[in-house]
Amino acid sequence: MAEEGITAGGVMDVNTALQEVLKTALIHDGLARGIREAAKALDKRQAHLCVLASNCDEPMYVKLVEALCAEHQINLIKVDDNKKLGEWVGLCKIDREGKPRKVVGCSCVVVKDYGKESQAKDVIEEYFKCKK
């Protein structure tokens, strides 16, 4: 699970950093969304980071993604909710007030290209260094 309370230098927790990284990667066309795109990116070793929803309703998806990440030594983060993950990676409509609506759940996302160097990327990388 992506712990919420972890702060790197008291600046940004892992969930906030993850949202920033996903947003930047989305802008730079560096995301593979959904199990098919994600599995292809993982298999081709194009992935820097994989994000998996804990509430994925298909256990074989989870096994496949976890196995591919383990096989190719790709960092894996789990988030609580597939709707939240779908919102973070742009699988929704934004209404006039800027609030997301018609959010589509997304069980798996792979970051193929971070887009640019950022503090959020450093926080995520530091998180994985601490986990090892």
UniProtKB/Swiss-Prot annotation:
Any GO molecular function: structural constituent of ribosome
GO biological process, one term: ribosomal small subunit biogenesis
Presence of keyword Nucleus: yes
GO cellular component: cytosolic small ribosomal subunit; Golgi apparatus; nucleolus; small-subunit processome
Pfam family of the protein (one): Ribosomal_L7Ae
Subcellular location: Nucleus, Nucleolus
Keywords from the UniProt entry: Nucleus, Ribonucleoprotein, Ribosomal protein
Highest taxon listed in the record's lineage: Eukaryota
Stated family: Belongs to the eukaryotic ribosomal protein eS12 family.
Subunit structure of this chain's protein: Part of the small subunit (SSU) processome, composed of more than 70 proteins and the RNA chaperone small nucleolar RNA (snoRNA) U3. Subunit of the 40S ribosomal complex.
Biological role stated in the UniProt entry: Part of the small subunit (SSU) processome, first precursor of the small eukaryotic ribosomal subunit. During the assembly of the SSU processome in the nucleolus, many ribosome biogenesis factors, an RNA chaperone and ribosomal proteins associate with the nascent pre-rRNA and work in concert to generate RNA folding, modifications, rearrangements and cleavage as well as targeted degradation of pre-ribosomal RNA by the RNA exosome. Subunit of the 40S ribosomal complex.
Protein name (database record): Small ribosomal subunit protein eS12
Organism: Gallus gallus
